[in-house]
């Protein structure tokens, strides 16, 4: 579906659910969210349309949360960008992108390889919220109201994002029962369980709970198997920054409605869209709703039961 098809009442491009007037006339907002113990509990993840869980230095992960269909009163903690964000933001057209910390080296790929408008806490702190109940450097949070206002000041846009995935209410033909999924990273674990209505997330052995007391949930869970390249860059602790390659192809596992479809993801170039295919070349459709994508290094396989 093209972005032009995102009209009020029509399918939202990032969820497949009916679109609101506000969502039909604004770009996506990407936000870099921390995902280590010091950042917990996080906020706003259950209002994100799509969340990408991405490997970073030290075997941990960091999130790129994409907001569009809902207004959100609080999300975070917001942290620094990584090179892979540019490749994902390119899928969202003229998006806004919020992050904090890092260096101009982190910002380079965003400005060079995406059409996103960056909003950096270090430069414009007035667009962000500081919460004292989290320790430094996990205190920076945001709201859609403040960041959309900031984005409009910098790059006025009424263009919604193109669709990243396809959506359909019907269950894919040939889907197998699979109610539990674990994505094991080098130093982090994301585990999902189907409860009959949605997938609930555990992280590193504990229920993944948010500030509002809800457990992280999703309508769909997608596990993408990707190659990971050494960027040669190092973080402030001297640890090498990895680059998960989300341009190319690899295995994919799609979980919806307590079922699984295995196939292939394909994105042949930076400008190309992301496609999910079954083994016989049919498009894999997600259930309308919110989606988490576990971007898992191809040296590991998801555990499924």
Language model features with spans:
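A surface/extracellular/periplasmic glyco- and lipid-processing/surface-interacting theme
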Residues: 7-48, 57-305
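Short, low-complexity, disordered segments immediately C-terminal to signal peptides
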Residues: 1-7
